[in-house]
From Swiss-Prot:
Pfam families: DUF1090 (PF06476)
Biased composition, class Basic and acidic residues, residue ranges: 66-100
InterPro entries reported for this sequence: DUF1090
Protein name as catalogued: Protein YqjC
Underlying gene: yqjC
Provenance organism: Escherichia coli (strain K12)
Region spans: Disordered: 65-100
Length: 122
């Protein structure tokens, strides 16, 4: 019975997925999608964890807090990019080609992650 109720709730959430009006509702719907997927694959540990996350979102989520957290992530990633740029500059000073290539790769990864974060409209 629990399974049928959870499935019905999940399917309802999936059908209403395009109607999210707030960030918290969007987050809740994403968790419900994950629950549906976990139920499909009979992953009870994942279902339990997602149900706990869903309870937390329903109890504590606020759009302003999500925006603030997102801005913190962006600031942290900008610091990461700056650190990677510094590491690359130091590697170039030393002239070690292997380290330069490694630092360039890490810088590119950090910059890509920053772009993804900035593209998310919170």
């Amino acid at each position: 019975m629990k399974y049928r109720i959870a499935l019905a709730v999940s399917l309802f959430a999936l059908s209403a997925g395009s109607y999210a009006t707030t960030l918290c509702q969007e987050k809740e719907q994403n968790i419900l999608k994950e629950i549906s997927y976990a139920e499909k694959h009979q992953n009870q540990n994942r279902i339990d964890g997602l149900n706990k996350a869903l309870s937390e979102v329903r109890a504590n989520c606020s759009d302003s807090q999500l925006r603030a957290d997102h801005q913190k992530k962006i600031a942290k990633q900008k610091d990461e990019v700056a650190e990677r740029q510094q590491d690359l500059a130091e590697a170039k000073q030393k002239g070690d080609a292997d380290k330069i290539a490694k630092r360039e790769r890490k810088l590119a990864e950090a910059q890509e992650e920053l772009k993804k974060l900035e593209a998310r409209d919170y």
